[in-house]
């Protein structure tokens, strides 16, 4: 980012428009606020780490100022419960990143919409028609096939002694799982990418990149009209490409339905059927945005969890061995898992929980926004403030977790703690009415994928690197990822 541009932008915002937020004498504690920039100078290149250090000083509910935006950071289970459960309705609003104004995308997004009639319609379709146990049971063969495709790709790489970039491989697997579930076709190829599949994959990735870039307009909203950094313009280009591909796939399906009827019974058919039955609630334009939303939210998350977990297993060989021993005993060496196997693999489930605790896909839940002043823990959260729940901090709270920086899956063996939104010590998928609707699919896909990779291969770092030399540095996108992609060589294990 051009720091000169940032400075000029803030000066323009400060000179032309005084801060719109009124001061509150009863804000939670926080650091001294500088003119114009507020506390932005305290947020480093890895914001969730910098903010965790500030929270250790100022407490579990903390006040920051990001440009013109008052920001409240919550970093303890009790405070998270207050925001997400006890006063969920008061904090149901969202603060919209300026990049999502491109093509008015947020106005059709189940993630970003306020709790209005369209949001309730989309949420109902997702939770009652798509991510139900019955439908997920019926589609488990798809997930198994996509995992087998990944294992086959890894075997071919291993036979040639080539390393696999595990995050990218998992990303393609997630992309194909979603596209098969939604459209009944694959949109990614492990071996070559050309034409529409490559264009769509790049569009999704670039939307993610632009959406999370530090944006002047998010700190000084009046600057949105100038788009000084060009973020909204570039986001618009990538949204346009993604929506154009969506439109082509929808039109292709409509032509098929005219001739053959609704024969696929996939997610696209569910949406189109709903459009036909409830045209006053949903139309095809909204469907395109909603499906694009599923790809944006669903692909990066699974790949991030997979990469972090494999990195931790490489660095903790005793955990890898225990996982392999359990898998060998329950299903036999070298075999891919089926979803029905996961219930008999408690240590594998603990590995997933521990990875989600230590490396949640998103370090913060999407920012909440109260529409009125709200009292929390004796403090006043002002109307229009940005409220951030730090999932990263919850998972590393020494009051909740013994030795929180260590990777110890066994901590969950005798624990009832889970990640489905009922235990506020770890909330990787959120809680309450705005929790992730795709959670039921994630809890099926991630252990299936991880277990198959662990059981089908032995893994060594590329180039003879030792596990203790593996970098665990982070970079920040929509999800927190390894700064240096994990490249590991698969050594196929013979089936027994």
UniProtKB/Swiss-Prot annotation:
Its cofactor is heme. It comes from the Eukaryota. GO terms for molecular function: heme binding; iron ion binding; monooxygenase activity; oxidoreductase activity, acting on paired donors, with incorporation or reduction of molecular oxygen. It is found in: Endoplasmic reticulum membrane. The chain crosses the membrane at residues 3-23. Its EC number is 1.14.14.174. Keywords: Endoplasmic reticulum, Heme, Iron, Membrane, Metal-binding, Monooxygenase, Oxidoreductase, Transmembrane, Transmembrane helix. It catalyses: (2E)-geranylhydroquinone + reduced [NADPH--hemoprotein reductase] + O2 = (2Z)-3''-hydroxygeranylhydroquinone + oxidized [NADPH--hemoprotein reductase] + H2O + H(+). InterPro entries: Cyt_P450, Cyt_P450_CS, Cyt_P450_E_grp-I, Cyt_P450_sf. It holds the Pfam family p450. The keyword Repeat does not apply. One of its GO terms (cellular component) is endoplasmic reticulum membrane. Its main location: endoplasmic reticulum. Heme binds at residue 436. It is a single-pass membrane protein. Hydroxylase involved in the biosynthesis pathway of the red naphthoquinone pigment shikonin. Catalyzes the key step C-3''-hydroxylation of the prenylated phenolic intermediate geranylhydroquinone to form 3''-hydroxygeranylhydroquinone. PANTHER family: CYTOCHROME P450, FAMILY 76, SUBFAMILY C, POLYPEPTIDE 5-RELATED, GERANIOL 8-HYDROXYLASE-LIKE. Belongs to the cytochrome P450 family. This is Geranylhydroquinone 3''-hydroxylase CYP76B74. It comes from Arnebia euchroma. The lineage of its organism: Eukaryota, Viridiplantae, Streptophyta, Embryophyta, Tracheophyta. The gene is CYP76B74.
């Amino acid at each position: 980012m051009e720091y000169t541009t940032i400075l000029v932008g803030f000066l323009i915002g400060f000179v032309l428009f005084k801060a719109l937020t009124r001061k509150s004498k009863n804000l939670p504690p926080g650091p001294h606020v500088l003119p114009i920039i507020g506390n932005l100078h305290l947020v480093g290149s890895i914001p969730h780490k910098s903010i965790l250090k500030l929270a250790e000083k100022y407490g579990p509910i903390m006040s920051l100022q990001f440009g013109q935006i008052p920001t409240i950071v919550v970093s303890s289970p009790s405070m998270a419960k207050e925001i997400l459960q006890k006063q969920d309705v008061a904090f149901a609003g969202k603060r919209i990143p300026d990049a999502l104004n491109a093509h008015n995308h947020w106005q059709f997004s189940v993630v970003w919409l306020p709790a209005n009639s369209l949001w309730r319609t989309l949420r109902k379709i997702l939770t009652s028609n798509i991510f139900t146990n019955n439908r997920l049971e019926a589609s488990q063969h798809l997930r198994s096939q996509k995992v087998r495709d990944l294992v086959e790709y890894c075997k071919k790489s291993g036979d040639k002694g080539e390393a696999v970039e595990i995050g990218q491989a998992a990303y393609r697997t997630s992309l194909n799982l979603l596209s098969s579930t939604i459209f009944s076709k694959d949109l990614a190829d492990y071996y070559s990418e050309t034409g529409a599949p490559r264009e769509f994959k790049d569009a999704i990735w670039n939307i993610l990149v632009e959406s999370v870039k530090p944006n002047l307009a998010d700190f000084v909203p009046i600057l949105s009209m100038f788009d000084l950094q060009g973020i909204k313009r570039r986001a618009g280009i990538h949204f346009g490409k993604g929506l154009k591909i969506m439109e082509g796939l929808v039109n292709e399906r409509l032509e098929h339905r005219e001739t053959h009827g609704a024969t696929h019974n996939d997610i696209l058919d569910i949406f189109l059927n709903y459009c036909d039955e409830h045209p006053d609630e949903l139309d095809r334009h909204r469907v395109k945005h909603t499906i694009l939303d599923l790809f944006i939210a669903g692909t990066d998350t699974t790949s991030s969890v997979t990469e972090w977990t494999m990195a931790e297993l490489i660095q903790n060989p005793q955990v890898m061995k225990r996982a392999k021993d359990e898998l060998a005993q329950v299903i036999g060496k070298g075999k891919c898992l089926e979803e029905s196997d996961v219930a008999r693999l408690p240590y594998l489930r603990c590995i997933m929980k521990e990875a989600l605790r230590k490396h949640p896909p998103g370090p913060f839940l999407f920012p909440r926004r109260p529409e009125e002043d709200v009292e929390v823990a004796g403090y006043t959260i002002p109307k229009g403030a940005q409220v951030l729940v730090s999932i990263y901090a919850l998972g590393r709270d020494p009051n909740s977790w013994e030795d929180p920086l260590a990777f110890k899956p066994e901590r969950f063996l005798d624990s009832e703690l889970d990640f489905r939104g009922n235990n506020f010590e770890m909330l990787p998928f959120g809680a309450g009415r705005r929790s992730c609707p795709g959670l039921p699919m994630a809890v099926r896909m991630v252990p299936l994928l991880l277990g198959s990779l662990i059981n089908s291969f032995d893994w060594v770092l590329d180039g003879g690197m030792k596990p203790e030399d593996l970098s665990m540095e982070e970079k920040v996108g929509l999800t927190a990822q390894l700064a240096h992609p994990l490249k590991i060589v698969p050594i196929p294990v013979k089936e027994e």
